From Swiss-Prot:
This is Nucleoprotein. The lineage of its organism: Viruses, Riboviria, Orthornavirae, Negarnaviricota, Haploviricotina. GO terms for molecular function: RNA binding. GO terms for cellular component: helical viral capsid; host cell cytoplasm; ribonucleoprotein complex; viral nucleocapsid. The gene is N. It is found in: Virion; Host cytoplasm. Encapsidates the genome in a ratio of one N per nine ribonucleotides, protecting it from nucleases. The encapsidated genomic RNA is termed the NC and serves as template for transcription and replication. The nucleocapsid is bullet-shaped with the tip containing 8 turns of a conical spiral before reaching the helical cylindrical trunk. Nucleocapsid assembly is concomitant with replication, therefore viral replication depends on the intracellular concentration of free N, termed N(0). All replicative products are resistant to nucleases. It comes from Vesicular stomatitis New Jersey virus (strain Ogden subtype Concan) (VSNJV). Homomultimerizes to form the nucleocapsid. Binds to viral genomic RNA; this interaction contributes to the virion assembly. N in the nucleocapsid interacts (via C-terminus) with the P protein (via C-terminus); this interaction allows to package the L polymerase in the virion and positions the polymerase on the template, since P acts as a bridge between N and L. N(0) interacts with the P protein; this interaction prevents the uncontrolled aggregation of N(0). Interacts with the matrix protein (inner layer); this interaction contributes to the virion assembly. Interacts with the L polymerase.
Amino acid sequence: MAPTVKRIINDSIIQPKLPANEDPVEYPADYFKNNTNIVLYVSTKVALNDLRAYVYQGIKSGNPSILHINAYLYAALKGVEGTLDRDWVSFGRTIGKREENVKIFDLVKVEELKTALPDGKSDPDRSAEDDKWLPIYILGLYRVGRSKVTDYRKKLLDGLENQCRVASTRFESLVEDGLDFFDIWENDPNFTKIVAAVDMFFHMFKKHERAPIRYGTIVSRFKDCAALATFGHLSKVSGLSIEDLTTWVLNREVADELCQMMYPGQEIDKADSYMPYMIDFGLSQKSPYSSVKNPAFHFWGQLAALLLRSTRAKNARQPDDIEYTSLTCASLLLSFAVGSSADIEQQFYIGEDKYTTEKDDSLKKSDVPPKGRNVVDWLGWYDDNGGKPTPDMLNFARRAVSSLQSLREKTIGKYAKVEFDK
C-alpha cells in the first residue's frame, strides 16, 4: 500500500501519479488461453511454378511482392516433414505424437488469404531445382535485413550465399551490397509466422537434410528476449547457478524485473515450446523478456559480465532513465566477489585421498574480503566498509576496462570505460 502524502499548509491529501505511457507486457501462455491456433493467412491457389518465377524475378528487380514471397515459401516448404521421437506439446496444444510425421505448417492453422495476389513476371528458366536454394536465400535475407551495421550485413550476405551454393549449383546472387528492399519484410505478420514455423520445426529436427535453412531463421528464436539472455550469459561467465545468481540481486528494480521474467507457466525452459517464437508468431506484442521492459536487470547483468571480462557485453545497449549509481555498485560488488574467488574444489579422488576444508572463525577482519561467493558474507563486508566501493574494487574495475577500445556510444562498454577508467 502506498504511503499517504499530505501538504504541510493544510494537511490535504494528494495522490501522486504518472501517466500510463507504456503498454503492459504480454505473456505467451495468455495467448493460448484465448486462442486455439496461430493462424497463417497465405494464398494457396497459385501454382508453385508460377510463384517461383514471380519471386525470383521480383527479388532480381528489387521489388518483390511479400504476398508472392509468403505464397512461394508455403508452397515450396509445405511438404517437408519429420518423424517425431517423442510427443510434441506446447501450451496444451498437441503438435504431434511420438512416431508421427509432422510438417512445418502443422505448427499453425493455414487459412486462405482473401487478398488477390498481384501479377508477377514469368520465367521459363526456373525449375524445381531452384527450390533447393531460393527459400534459403529469402529467409536469409530476413536475417540480413534485421542488422543495421553495414559491415555485419555484408558478412551475413556472404555467408548466406555460401549456404545457397552448397544447397544447389543453380544458385544465383540476386542482391547486391547496399540494397535494403527486404528490410521491411519483418513488418509482415504472415511472413514472420512462416519464419518462426520454419525455425521451430528445424530446431526440433536439427539433423534434417533441409535444416541449413535455419541460417536465416535462427534470429527468430528468442527474439526480443535480450534480458533473459543476459541472465543466462551472466550465469555462464560468473560460474554461478541461476539460483545462486538470483541471491545476488540487490536492487528493487532488478528484483521486480526478474520476477516479471520468471512469471510461471511460460515454458521458458522448454526447448520445443512456442515461447521462443512468441514475437514472430504474434503471441505477444510486448515481450516480458526484452531489455526495453527490463532495463535495470539488463544493465546490471551486462555490466557485471563486462567486469568479468565478457567480450560480448561491451556492445550491449545502455538503457536510458535508470538508477545508474546503485545498479553500478551492485554490479561491481558481484563481479568483484566472483573475480576475487576461484570456485575450484576437488572433483574426483582415489582411495581415501580426499581434501576437506576446515572453517576458521577465530579471526574476522572487516577489511579482508570473504573467500567464497556467499552474498551474505559479501554484504556484511561491504557494509563494514561503509557501504561503498573500496579502492580494491575500483582497481578491479579499472583493470577490467583498461584495454577496451573502439567502443560505440550508448553501450555498456562505453559507460564502464568512462565510469571506471579514470
